[in-house]
Amino acid sequence: MSQRNTINYWLVVDTIRIPDAISVITNKMKVEQAIVLFAGSDFDYLQDKSPLLLNIGSHSEVLEKWLTLPNFDSSSVIFELDSRHDGFEFTEYLQSLLQVKIDNKACFLRFYTNAFWNQTASQLNDIDIATLLGPAQAIHWVDTAHHRQTLHYPPQVSEPSQAFNLTSPIFKLWV
């Protein structure tokens, strides 16, 4: 009999838009682990402006609680990550995702905002979805109608290489 792996929910929140994010979250839910996303990355010098990466546990009700947090609908996303994956490993992956190539041009990617996902999700090819999700199984964000949206890792797509080249046509409009 196969055992089902536990999912951990990882919240990435833009602390420029929500400076008191950690206190707002800890008042509503338990934080298992908190990581400053820019710490140890090429953007280490911007730690005071860094998004936070928070493991908010393995219970799916955190998705509903998240929807009730003020301003989090526009300034955060939640990744679903198999508990076999280490938080620091995931952090390194997300740090790499901050700098991508679009049409051979280096770009800073704010993948941790709903605006990014609202603009791109329906137009992403499977390879870009796999690149953007990396080891995560899914991502959740809030659309403009305040409904939670979810994008799952595409079936039958292998793990992307570490060359973060985004090729969906939507990105060509950005460069």
Language model features: what each stretch is:
Residues 1-108, 112-175:
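Non-transmembrane, aqueous-exposed alpha-helical and coiled segments at domain scale
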